[in-house]
Amino acid sequence: MVQRWLYSTNAKDIAVLYFMLAIFSGMAGTAMSLIIRLELAAPGSQYLQGNAQLFNVLVVGHAVLMIFFLVMPALIGGFGNYLLPLMIGATDTAFPRINNIAFWVLPMGLVCLVTSTLVESGAGTGWTVYPPLSSIQAHSGPSVDLAIFALHLTSISSLLGAINFIVTTLNMRTNGMTMHKLPLFVWSIFITAFLLLLSLPVLSAGITMLLLDRNFNTSFFEVAGGGDPILYEHLFYFFGHPEVYILIIPGFGIISHVVSTYSKKPVFGEISMVYAMASIGLLGFLVWSHHMYIVGLDADTRAYFTSATMIIAIPTGIKIFSWLATIYGGSIRLATPMLYAIAFLFLFTMGGLTGVALANASLDVAFHDTYYVVGHFHYVLSMGAIFSLFAGYYYWSPQILGLNYNEKLAQIQFWLIFIGANVIFFPMHFLGINGMPRRIPDYPDAFAGWNYVASIGSFIATLSLFLFIYILYDQLVNGLNNKVNNKSVIYTKAPDFVESNTIFNLNTVKSSSIEFLLTSPPAVHSFNTPAVQS
């Protein structure tokens, strides 16, 4: 056991470790968000005894856990490691031992993050860690330093993983698997890896300067010494904006596969989908200052960032309409993954529309730092990244585990989280339009109604997550019985471009990507000879 899981160099085992870490961190992050919502359920101090610092520590804990320890490990580390080698017919990733260390620095980062909340009064800086609030004057203990170390460790992990994915995709494709034949999920991980490679060094530079400012008396962000805190914001958001595309692009890849399968049609405009993802990735580097409209940028700078941000809506629109064109006229089967995919389309579009409002520099003067922004990015993350994560889990887990989940329970879980998430985040737009600020644990009585509604929604969503944990348990215990009761996903695959040959176990099935042609669960080493792409 220790040999297999601690020293593992097998991409599939490492992927399972990533999933376990992601589920654990997701539970912790959800618990924090529930405490936040309980505190905000009514005006006045509810649970935190008026401790605003603790409230902000919960906010930063919730944010960092959900972003760096749930979405990225699950979508990139989990699905990426498991499926990318299978889909291109590779034996493993290019650097199996780098893969191992890339995982094992994450638990260390988690330890640093938890420790930072426990020493002194915690890092109450918000996930952006802006100086001067994060400076040694305002946060005197080691909390912020530990949070910076946590971010450094997750950066190292993601960089190593990104290098691994890029080299694997370029060098280890099977015979006949040209770049034009790559499945869309592989493309999405490939593009995400480039984004990580280009943006993370800038974040590391910024937080290292902050570390030096705090402990070694430099003044990068210290006005008294000729520094400028705005420099930190530029460095942080040059990472922070590509980061949100890093979180969602693997989701795009998953949704493409799910929509194709359950409509029984190839994806509409596959090459255009790849170019759209690449354009989104490229443009993501050119728009960072739309997070900073109110720091005193020039009018022409604000005009540029407004226009550039709106241009991102074009490739995003191409993707949405291509998915709709894939569904249109298809033979649609509303299995759980397809429900998540359709919900993703509606809610991600909704989040994108509020984003178009926020892109305007003049409107953002009113919206900045209000709950309108919180509503916007939780629509695209909670109902974009997380819904695609669930879609991918329900789509691939029967193939990965050889065990089926209970379809009826899974659909109940979908409707619970669909209703819950909307009830939480839709009212936040109203609160933001009325000027309720973010990161504040108390508010005037006028905001009480919608906050109460949002807090009820968080209970519904949390209930659905408890149900998901039970579905996992049921899948592992009763998976074979469920397989008899559910029609498995494999018989509804879209007839597409990959022919099976003798190395596959199911010679009758045609599939748009190789992974469903293997045994279920796949062998520890899937391809001892190169797979052949027709």
Swiss-Prot record:
<feature type="binding site">
    <location>
        <position position="441"/>
    </location>
    <ligand>
        <name>Ca(2+)</name>
    </ligand>
</feature>
<keyword id="KW-0106">Calcium</keyword>
<feature type="binding site" description="axial binding residue">
    <location>
        <position position="378"/>
    </location>
    <ligand>
        <name>Fe(II)-heme a</name>
    </ligand>
</feature>
<dbReference type="Pfam" id="PF00115">
    <property type="entry name" value="COX1"/>
</dbReference>
<feature type="transmembrane region" description="Helical">
    <location>
        <begin position="414"/>
        <end position="434"/>
    </location>
</feature>
<keyword id="KW-0999">Mitochondrion inner membrane</keyword>
<keyword id="KW-0186">Copper</keyword>
<dbReference type="GO" id="GO:0045277">
    <property type="term" value="C:respiratory chain complex IV"/>
</dbReference>
<keyword id="KW-1133">Transmembrane helix</keyword>
<feature type="transmembrane region" description="Helical">
    <location>
        <begin position="101"/>
        <end position="121"/>
    </location>
</feature>
<dbReference type="GO" id="GO:0006123">
    <property type="term" value="P:mitochondrial electron transport, cytochrome c to oxygen"/>
</dbReference>
<feature type="transmembrane region" description="Helical">
    <location>
        <begin position="267"/>
        <end position="287"/>
    </location>
</feature>
<feature type="binding site">
    <location>
        <position position="44"/>
    </location>
    <ligand>
        <name>Ca(2+)</name>
    </ligand>
</feature>
<feature type="binding site">
    <location>
        <position position="369"/>
    </location>
    <ligand>
        <name>Mg(2+)</name>
    </ligand>
</feature>
<feature type="transmembrane region" description="Helical">
    <location>
        <begin position="452"/>
        <end position="472"/>
    </location>
</feature>
<feature type="transmembrane region" description="Helical">
    <location>
        <begin position="57"/>
        <end position="77"/>
    </location>
</feature>
<feature type="binding site">
    <location>
        <position position="241"/>
    </location>
    <ligand>
        <name>Cu cation</name>
    </ligand>
</feature>
<keyword id="KW-0460">Magnesium</keyword>
<feature type="transmembrane region" description="Helical">
    <location>
        <begin position="338"/>
        <end position="358"/>
    </location>
</feature>
<keyword id="KW-0479">Metal-binding</keyword>
<keyword id="KW-0813">Transport</keyword>
<feature type="binding site">
    <location>
        <position position="39"/>
    </location>
    <ligand>
        <name>Ca(2+)</name>
    </ligand>
</feature>
<keyword id="KW-0472">Membrane</keyword>
<keyword id="KW-0349">Heme</keyword>
<dbReference type="InterPro" id="IPR000883">
    <property type="entry name" value="Cyt_C_Oxase_1"/>
</dbReference>
<keyword id="KW-0812">Transmembrane</keyword>
<dbReference type="InterPro" id="IPR023615">
    <property type="entry name" value="Cyt_c_Oxase_su1_BS"/>
</dbReference>
<feature type="transmembrane region" description="Helical">
    <location>
        <begin position="235"/>
        <end position="255"/>
    </location>
</feature>
<feature type="binding site">
    <location>
        <position position="368"/>
    </location>
    <ligand>
        <name>Mg(2+)</name>
    </ligand>
</feature>
<dbReference type="InterPro" id="IPR033944">
    <property type="entry name" value="Cyt_c_oxase_su1_dom"/>
</dbReference>
<keyword id="KW-1278">Translocase</keyword>
<dbReference type="GO" id="GO:0020037">
    <property type="term" value="F:heme binding"/>
</dbReference>
<feature type="binding site">
    <location>
        <position position="291"/>
    </location>
    <ligand>
        <name>Cu cation</name>
    </ligand>
</feature>
<dbReference type="GO" id="GO:0046872">
    <property type="term" value="F:metal ion binding"/>
</dbReference>
<feature type="transmembrane region" description="Helical">
    <location>
        <begin position="16"/>
        <end position="36"/>
    </location>
</feature>
<comment type="similarity">
    <text>Belongs to the heme-copper respiratory oxidase family.</text>
</comment>
<feature type="transmembrane region" description="Helical">
    <location>
        <begin position="372"/>
        <end position="392"/>
    </location>
</feature>
<keyword id="KW-0679">Respiratory chain</keyword>
<dbReference type="GO" id="GO:0015990">
    <property type="term" value="P:electron transport coupled proton transport"/>
</dbReference>
<comment type="subunit">
    <text>Component of the cytochrome c oxidase (complex IV, CIV), a multisubunit enzyme composed of a catalytic core of 3 subunits and several supernumerary subunits. The complex exists as a monomer or a dimer and forms supercomplexes (SCs) in the inner mitochondrial membrane with ubiquinol-cytochrome c oxidoreductase (cytochrome b-c1 complex, complex III, CIII).</text>
</comment>
<feature type="binding site" description="axial binding residue">
    <location>
        <position position="62"/>
    </location>
    <ligand>
        <name>Fe(II)-heme a</name>
    </ligand>
</feature>
<dbReference type="GO" id="GO:0004129">
    <property type="term" value="F:cytochrome-c oxidase activity"/>
</dbReference>
